[in-house]
Curated annotation (Swiss-Prot):
Entry membrane topology: Multi-pass membrane protein
UniProt similarity note: Belongs to the insect chemoreceptor superfamily. Heteromeric odorant receptor channel (TC 1.A.69) family. Or49a subfamily.
Molecular function via GO: ionotropic olfactory receptor activity; odorant binding; olfactory receptor activity
InterPro entries noted in UniProt: 7tm6_olfct_rcpt
A Gene Ontology term for the protein's cellular component: plasma membrane
Main location as per UniProt: membrane
Name of protein: Putative odorant receptor 65b
Gene name linked to the record: Or65b
Species this protein is from: Drosophila melanogaster (Fruit fly)
Subunit-structure text: Interacts with Orco. Complexes exist early in the endomembrane system in olfactory sensory neurons (OSNs), coupling these complexes to the conserved ciliary trafficking pathway.
Amino acid sequence: MDIQRFLKFYKVGWKTYRDPLMEASHSSIYYWREQMKAMALFTTTEERLLPYRSKWHTLVYIQMVIFFASMSFGLTESMGDHVQMGRDLAFILGAFFIIFKTYYFCWYGDELDQVISDLDALHPWAQKGPNPVEYQTGKRWYFVMAFFLATSWSFFLCILLLLLITSPMWVHQQNLPFHAAFPFQWHEKSLHPISHAIIYLFQSYFAVYCLTWLLCIEGLSICIYAEITFGIEVLCLELRQIHRHNYGLQELRMETNRLVKLHQKIVEILDRTNDVFHGTLIMQMGVNFSLVSLSVLEAVEARKDPKVVAQFAVLMLLALGHLSMWSYCGDQLSQKSLQISEAAYEAYDPTKGSKDVYRDLCVIIRRGQDPLIMRASPFPSFNLINYSAILNQCYGILTFLLKTLD
């Protein structure tokens, strides 16, 4: 692992935060990708051609199969203990989510890389030259937001990993960070102390590696949609200030034509992004809903035990927090995209321009009336309205369980 390459995002982010006049040379998604490359788990054709990279990817996939199979086998030991089964199922769902994402981006790595390259090439979206629109404030805000997102996530991830790895030291019924079972009872400390130590180290290392990779891919995914949202904001700025240069008819026609193409490029990249993340968006919606339902079920069943209720309440909040983050990001994308038609309407000036200019503005107005959405068909789009519907559904499940058990 290339530590310097991995930490570059934090160094650049801190310098950008400290110096208001400093501009990062790349967008945040470029640095997220660099972190995944530093971990040797950015699965593109180009990366697999590097020395030993393909072998490392294969080794990681084998470790994932072993990790998931041992946890699934450990579930059989929890039969009869509903609380322990709930914990095991929660970790199994989380492990399955990570494994699915890893294998998924093994197939879609090249498409993801192309989306990142296209977005980074268009960044900061504004037309270069004299007197550009004031995009620096938005660019800085999105980059610093990504930096603080990465920093806060990393901080809480370190706490979570510390609790997981040290849990056998303060939880008497647990002898491994994750409940698992191996053939010949290799996981039993009293029978096989050496193999138990190896399994302990394997689970600790693999949890650190996989959860760090998950943080990077989640940050990358969120920031890709945030970058598209920033592109929409710049497009709106340029539309509202299209007459700032006092263009002649020919120059104004060229400018409106460029903005039509920029709008089309944003729509095209969003469509490709939704295609790339189609499987993962469906999976995370399913996993989050499953974790929330499982947490509600276990908390209701063990409602007389405050410790158990607190554990599953935290799990439920984590799942809802993850879903709310994606819903908010999708909602912002949709809301900002609806401002495009308003900005194009403001750009209309009957005293300036020609029929071709008005036609270009009409094209943007017509396209801008349809909101751009983060969606994985056939499921509904990610926004706060659908998020509220999910919360209502969870509340309905909780009410039903309480009435049934009472």
